[in-house]
């Protein structure tokens, strides 16, 4: 029960952290349908433009943002499942949406780079100077924000979206990259992905599952968004030739096998 509650609390934070100004009584929590045994509450309401989140080893919740350009740290000091204190651990960044935590360090993305803040939970009030993991990511703003996470192989994964609605561009666009924690060994893990903003690994098979937001201007609800899984490196998931698995693109799908 405790694990289920906390999972939904974090899910709820995804929806509620960016609401400002507000109180918990203003939020329509009753509209969120939950399975039996789950509960949802407001964790914090003072985090502007909240996006991705990750937990530190000591329970600090780190939150990325987009237009705010900040990375926040939320601390629940009395263990009542509500944030008691908020720190801004970085600011002035270009869409620092993605955050991940490994070996005591916070990893944070901006559009064209990934930074690392070492021993961050011991210095929230005086954050360390970040280490640049990589600054070689594309800087195009269209689908340019970078969500990040560590896989079960210890590699850091980052999707790189297509810089357009639909187009053909060379690597690393329309792909998911991975690299070692120090930024070395960067490689394309999967291709043909327009814009993935959510991904996770199956706890048993370790297979990567990820969403893909389909192209615009084909019609209402067309193409559908995708939920894909990649059991090995080197797979191609169709973009820009095929959408939703079996829908040829009117411009780029000629001759493509979308069956």
Where in the sequence are the language-model features?
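Asp-box/WD-like beta-propeller blade repeats and closely related beta-sheet repeat scaffolds
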Residues: 100, 112-151, 159-162, 185, ...
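A short helix->beta-strand "capping" segment at the edge of beta-propeller domains
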Residues: 26-48, 84
């Amino acid at each position: 029960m405790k694990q289920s509650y906390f999972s939904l609390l974090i899910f709820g934070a995804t929806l509620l952290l960016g609401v400002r100004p507000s109180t918990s009584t203003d939020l329509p929590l009753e509209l969120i349908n939950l399975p039996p045994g789950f509960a949802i509450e407001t964790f914090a309401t003072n985090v502007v433009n909240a996006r991705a989140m990750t937990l530190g080893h000591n329970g600090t919740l780190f939150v990325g943002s987009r237009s705010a350009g900040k990375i926040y740290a939320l601390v629940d000091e009395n263990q009542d499942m509500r944030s008691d204190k908020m720190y801004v651990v970085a600011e002035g960044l270009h869409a620092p949406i993605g955050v991940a935590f490994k070996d005591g360090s916070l990893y944070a993305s901006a559009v064209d780079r990934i930074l690392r803040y070492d021993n961050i939970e011991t210095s929230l009030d005086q954050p360390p100077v970040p280490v640049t993991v990589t600054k070689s990511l594309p800087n195009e703003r269209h689908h340019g924000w970078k969500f990040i996470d560590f896989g079960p192989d210890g590699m850091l994964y980052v999707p790189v979206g297509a810089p357009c609605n639909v187009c053909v561009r060379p690597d690393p666009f329309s792909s998911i990259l991975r690299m070692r924690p120090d930024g070395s060994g960067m490689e394309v893990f999967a291709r043909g992905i327009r814009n993935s903003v959510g991904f996770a690994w199956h706890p048993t098979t370790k297979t990567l599952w990820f969403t893909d937001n389909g192209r615009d201007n084909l019609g209402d609800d067309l193409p559908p968004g995708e939920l894909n899984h990649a059991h090995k490196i080197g797979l191609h998931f169709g973009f820009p030739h095929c959408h939703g698995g079996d829908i040829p693109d009117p411009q780029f799908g000629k001759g493509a096998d979308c069956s």
